[in-house]
Design a protein with these regions (language model features):
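N-terminal intrinsically disordered/low-complexity leader segments
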Residues: 1-13
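Amphipathic, non-transmembrane alpha-helical scaffold segments
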Residues: 11, 15, 65, 69, ...
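Helix-turn-helix
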Residues: 17, 21, 25-59, 63
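Short coil/turn segments at alpha/beta junctions that flank glycine-rich nucleotide-binding fingerprints
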Residues: 28-32, 83, 143
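Hydrophobic alpha-helical connector segments
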Residues: 63, 74-103
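A short secondary-structure junction motif
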Residues: 71, 100-104, 136, 140
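Short secondary-structure transition hinges
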Residues: 93-132
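Hydrophobic alpha-helical bundle segments that form small-molecule/ligand-binding pockets
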Residues: 127-151
Length: 151
């Protein structure tokens, strides 16, 4: 029984490591340039192990982006909950985005269009993010930090 628990915790940790390694590689080289074999080699695991955990490259990309978005949102939420003003939180979101743009290979954004499941997720996430941003801006107006008549 102990062996099964260790195996499961190892697999869970490995799933996370795969997503981190894949996202770093995708952002650095572009999605099409990164092969599943590259990810497996980087983590010193077999391709078989990789394919036992994730069905294909699109699933790895999809899960990586979901994780990345969740972590970014958690970071901003934590920053906002630390008592920073609305303007400071907006600037932090801007800093995060600019850092991302600076670090990400432009091919990454072009390659995403070739993965329909991922493209759909990004569109849906963008809509939700925009709604949250507008609600946040409204909070800034209510606090008197932002002007209502500005678009």
């Amino acid at each position: 029984m102990q062996e099964i628990k260790e195996t499961n915790s190892y697999r869970l940790a490995l799933k996370d490591k795969i997503l981190d390694a894949a996202m770093n590689a995708f952002m650095k080289y572009g999605i099409r340039a990164v092969k599943m074999d590259d990810i497996a080699q980087q983590l010193t695991i077999s391709k078989r192990t990789l394919y036992e955990i994730y069905e294909d490259k699109e699933e790895v990309l999809y899960r990586s982006i979901i994780k990345y978005d969740r972590l970014r949102l958690e970071r901003l939420t934590k920053y906002a909950e630390e008592g920073h003003h609305v303007i400071d939180v907006i600037l932090e979101a801007y800093r995060i985005k600019m850092n991302e743009v600076r670090m990400v290979n432009p091919a990454f954004y072009e390659d995403i269009l070739k993965y329909p499941k991922v493209e759909t997720y990004i569109k849906e996430f963008s809509i939700k993010s925009k709604d949250k941003f507008l609600a946040f801006m409204q909070l800034g107006v209510e606090q008197g930090l932002l002007r209502k008549e500005v678009d």
